[in-house]
From Swiss-Prot:
This is Pentatricopeptide repeat-containing protein At4g18975, chloroplastic. PPR repeats lie at residues 165-199, 201-235. Keywords: Chloroplast, Plastid, Repeat, Transit peptide. The keyword Plastid applies. It comes from Arabidopsis thaliana. It is found in: Plastid, Chloroplast. Residues 1-34 form a transit peptide.
């Protein structure tokens, strides 16, 4: 170490190559009174060397601690500035856009060319297809019982390759039922059955059974029920009653009793005040 190169005869410390702490120690030694012997000066010099090393280590620890603190603060600041651009929330204006679409459709004639042309203009300047606004518009039209507009909007969405979901199919089948279009409903149902054979929910089967029962197509009701049996989908209570009624209209009393025994037993279980309770099932004379 440079501090240890002390000339005992001259009493001078060479200051070249020394750190700040070492220079301070050397100046303190020069200002102190001359030592009586070389051994005492050597002992003090050894103590100064140890003290200078200790001060350098402490200074290094302080520097490293300060750098670590600054880096941690910088990391926290960077974390606050992160943005997840891949997360896309529902826009707040989709509801108003749906209302504008419903208002536009209500003022159009019932011609297919006029409706499709207006819908194409509505979506022309959109970067992405406004599927949320279109779905909300379908729900609004359904609540208003504007079944013809529901059919037009749903068909237009499907022609664009959008909205091919079970919810859209359910609304469209209901609109076909209410608008007396059983043939179009059957065509759509056959497409759904061949395309989504293993993923058709029970709600859609119930919709078709209700549609055919509403139009007194009892043989079609039995066909849909046979598809449910093949796909191992259990009918709900209303669907089972309609199937039993269809068997009765077709004079198949044995099958009717089988349906009643399998799916409509004398008792059923319901939940009342958080408890499972067995109650007697009600049977009407039409069942």
């Amino acid at each position: 170490m440079a501090l240890c190169n002390l000339n005992p005869t001259q009493g001078i410390f060479p200051l070249q190559g020394l750190s700040k702490s070492q220079e301070f120690i050397c100046f303190s030694l020069l200002q102190s009174p001359r030592c009586g012997s070389y051994s005492s000066l050597k002992t003090k010099r050894f103590g100064f060397c140890i003290r200078s090393k200790f001060s350098e280590k402490e200074a290094g620890k302080l520097d490293r601690g300060y750098v670590a603190t600054v880096n941690s603060k910088e990391i926290k600041k960077v974390g606050k500035k992160e943005h997840h651009l891949w997360k896309k929330n529902d826009s707040a204006g989709s509801g108003q856009k749906a209302l504008n679409l419903v208002r536009m459709l209500s003022g159009l004639p019932n011609e297919k060319e006029a409706v499709y042309g207006a819908l194409n203009k509505w979506v022309a300047w959109e970067v992405e297809f406004p599927i949320i606004a279109a779905a909300k518009a379908l729900q609004i039209l359904r609540k208003r019982s504007q079944w013809h507009r529901v059919i037009q909007l749903a068909k237009w969405m499907l022609s664009k390759g959008q909205g091919a979901t079970m919810g859209t199919y359910d609304i469209l089948l209901l609109a076909f039922d209410m608008d007396e279009r059983a043939d179009e409903a059957e065509s759509l149902w056959n497409m759904i059955l061949h395309t989504h054979t293993r993923s058709i929910p029970r709600r859609l089967f119930a919709r078709m059974i209700a549609l055919y029962a509403h139009h007194d197509l009892h043989d079609k009701v039995i066909e849909v029920f046979a598809d449910m049996e093949e796909l191992k989908v259990s009918p709900d209570e209303d669907s089972a009653r309609r199937v039993a009624r269809a068997f009765r209209e077709l004079n198949q009393e044995e099958n009717r009793k089988l349906i009643l025994r399998r799916y409509l037993s004398e008792y059923k279980y319901i939940y009342f005040n958080g408890e499972r309770v067995r109650v007697k099932r009600y049977f009407s004379e039409d069942s």
